[in-house]
Amino acid sequence: MEEAFSFAGMAEVPFFTVLSSRPGPGTGVPTYTEQADLRFALGQGHGDFPRVVASPGTVPEAFRLAAEMLSLVWTYQAAGILLTEKHLSESRVTSELDASSVAWAEPVAHSGGEYKRYALTDDGVSPLLFPPSSESIKWSSYEHDEAGITTELAEDIAAMHDKRDRKGAALTEHLRSAQTVNHFGEDGPLILTYGSTTMSVLEALVAGDIRARVVQPVYLEPFPVWEFGDLSDEPAVVVEQSSTGQ
């Protein structure tokens, strides 16, 4: 998985995977749930390249988020991880899912002329071309020029690094208009949590008749820092199902 994820970062392959964590390390406790793979997901693959990581709290949210992330990885030709836990991925629940609420991705398509797989663009996203075509289509895991030809020239390497950085910035800007954080409650102490642990926290608050505000970041990379400006100086309880509080 590590190598494939990094390959996708360099080749700019739309790559989407589901990571469902459980207690580790090693075989661990495979029939129970845990959230110890957060750092593993955020740091997946060697090298610097844009990626998107998001974690749903409920089954309907998992459905919506999976469709949304598929659209993102195709639109931005990036690698993505839907991070969940054994608790959610193996739960049984009856939900009404609105298929009309999701849409097919519409990646930027090549419009004609000489095709450059890694064409330098303002937002870092190169147009895609699909077979059949008389044009040569190259996908390279080696650093490359615009045509996808292997290169070790410093100026080409810098240009492609800058291209990928621009793409990451465009992805982050896109998420500013998306639902990246969920808020529950209007007053009381602040609790931060993510993933399916959110529902456990809300259930515990109801059972204990406790008033609190619960903030659940849905997108973990790029992290929606713009949603946390008003909370940056406020004390909070972080409820996360890992021994180190990743």
PLM segments and residue spans:
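Thiamine diphosphate
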Residues: 1-40, 52-73
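N-proximal short alpha-helices
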Residues: 35-42, 133, 137
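A broad, low-specificity signal for short, low-complexity segments enriched in glycine/proline
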Residues: 11-17, 40-45, 147-155, 202-203
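A glycine-rich, acidic short-motif signal
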Residues: 44-52
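Preference for short coil/turn "hinge" residues that link or interrupt alpha-helices
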Residues: 31-34, 47, 213
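Flexible, low-complexity linker and terminal segments
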Residues: 65, 70-246
